[in-house]
């Protein structure tokens, strides 16, 4: 009788390429042959192709979701004839602490780039770890001096696919504690360096996550002392910030009030932005026709909805508001927190044209300071080189 381990390598690879991501850990623990095969680059290419094929054909969308300071792989179905559904498929391959091998369940922020995740823990001193969920590989990043609560980060790569981390510190609204620092970490050299050519006349709010696209990171930024808003991009090849990039609207931000602006991506080539005015509650979703570190063109208003027709106080939180676009159904799904209930609830709002609106309760959020974050996910073939 033929057993799995006796099958030809090509056939075995074809079978294992269809295994869901959340089951790969069990596959790898079965035997050394399967473990080695699952980490082979040719196998991984098949896995990525299969994953993308399933995403195109399936009515369900698989995303990474952060809730209650943990990271999950979640299936979202908004194409059924009843109500949209959000089904957790389980945690991705466990993120563990190298020091004690305990599972890390205190992730306060997540930054995504090309299948890799940069996670910031909410420990007393804050820690950074880069994680490839597919391989289960991690690298804990030691600070040059120390990390701070209001630090902002970006994960990207240069033209040679060398990954780097940008750390931003700018306490614009705390002049007595004013610190402006920009540091860059290289995976190749395992070291930080100060980005010396930066003296910005703009600032990025600490809760602004930014958006990684084609290796570079884009943020919504505002000029200091003046209500002028725009996008700013950090190019990980030149290791510099580019020029101000236009937005298709004018937003307002101050210590007392602010509009909501968040970024997302459409596929691997387009940038999308959500804008909601605090005064009118009108929500706009725009998509780029061209996006580079030095040029952005907007030519498509994907969706415009008057949310005041739904509720006179329906405004997304500036700290939340992560979203994605479903082009098949022509809707946008926005993730937020409902803080009006007796308990905080993580919510998803499915909004479309002609008054289409669905509200989905994802579940209770145990922590007031944790906001739901969602990003699309495809496995990365980038292996994180372990430090010796």
UniProtKB/Swiss-Prot annotation:
Residue ranges occupied by any F-box domain in the UniProt entry: 1-47
UniProt xrefs under InterPro entries: F-box-assoc_dom_typ1, F-box-assoc_interact_dom, F-box-like_dom_sf, F-box_dom, Gal_Oxase/kelch_b-propeller, SCF_F-box_component
PROSITE patterns assigned: FBOX
PANTHER family in UniProt: BNACNNG10540D PROTEIN (PTHR31672), F-BOX PROTEIN CPR30-LIKE (PTHR31672:SF13)
The protein's name in its UniProt record: F-box protein At5g42460
Lineage start: Eukaryota, Viridiplantae, Streptophyta, Embryophyta, Tracheophyta
